[in-house]
Amino acid sequence: MPDVTLTTLQGLKQSGEKIAMLTCYDATFAHTASQAGVDVLLVGDSLGMVLQGHDSTLPVSNEEMAYHTACVKRGNKGSLIVTDLAFESSHSVAQTLADAVRLMQAGAHMVKLEGGAWLAEPIARLAQMGVPVCAHLGLTPQAVNLFGGFKVQGRQETQARQLRADAIALEQAGAAMLLLECVPSVLAEEITQAVKIPVIGIGAGAATDGQVLVMHDMLGLSLTGRSPKFVKDFMQGQESIPAAIAAYVRAVKDVSFPAAEHGFNA
């Protein structure tokens, strides 16, 4: 199978084939997931919670993100690697640019930034430098304290209108992909149709161009014993982790996941 590139993802959006994305933090899982057909591996700052045991993603450093990106690169067999810029990277445009370069040098093919239209400047600068960017809208975990917790975003019309505007503004700034987290399914569908770039959803319904889950969540692993509403345990009925990951890929591709029960109403 040829390596997945940004052009591949754009082609999948145009053809209507769904994009399967999973978080990944090490070489062994990168090898397993890429061999199972996962299109995109997300080296997420969620590692702060599922690997390090923090209650948010805020303590994660960009150097830790680079370390895990390098680990994933060594095991990857053709998936596109997207890496989160850490919370500490957002205090200035100069810092964002420098940290993005560090992640690309570590093996990322694209970096992910959380936030709204205010990200237009760093996204435009990164695009000029040849660094593809995935913009992350909706529930952005790095802003959990501003939101007052992990809550669905975009239910109020003013919020929904702002998210639509932000998506279009960030695409115009040069974002190559968009991730929508915990927004009403109807709103996610509207945004997916409004932009030309691939849109990946998590807790955003089935109408986005693809889906992403935290690897540990979809394998039924949790520090708290509770899973978010948008998660399905793909280990159920499977004999191995590779089989569970392959089942996830199939479910995303045939649109049997997510079901209505995994999404949110407006």
From Swiss-Prot:
Binding site for 3-methyl-2-oxobutanoate: D45, S46, D84, K112
UniProt keyword annotations, A-Z: Cytoplasm, Magnesium, Metal-binding, Pantothenate biosynthesis, Transferase
Catalytic activity: 3-methyl-2-oxobutanoate + (6R)-5,10-methylene-5,6,7,8-tetrahydrofolate + H2O = 2-dehydropantoate + (6S)-5,6,7,8-tetrahydrofolate
One of the GO biological process terms: pantothenate biosynthetic process
Entry keyword Transferase: yes
Pfam families attached to this UniProt entry: Pantoate_transf
InterPro entries per UniProt: Pantoate_hydroxy_MeTrfase (IPR003700), Pyrv/PenolPyrv_kinase-like_dom (IPR015813), Pyrv_kinase-like_dom_sf (IPR040442)
Keyword hit for Cytoplasm: yes
Active site, per annotation: E181
Cellular localisation: Cytoplasm
EC number: 2.1.2.11
Pathway: Cofactor biosynthesis; (R)-pantothenate biosynthesis; (R)-pantoate from 3-methyl-2-oxobutanoate: step 1/2
Cofactors named for this entry: Mg(2+)
CDD domains xrefs: KPHMT-like (cd06557)
GO MF annotation, one: magnesium ion binding
Chain positions recorded as Mg(2+) binding sites: D45, D84, E114
HAMAP family: PanB
Record's subunit section: Homodecamer; pentamer of dimers.
Biological function: Catalyzes the reversible reaction in which hydroxymethyl group from 5,10-methylenetetrahydrofolate is transferred onto alpha-ketoisovalerate to form ketopantoate.
Family per similarity comment: Belongs to the PanB family.
Designated name of the protein: 3-methyl-2-oxobutanoate hydroxymethyltransferase 2
UniProt organism field: Pseudomonas aeruginosa (strain UCBPP-PA14)
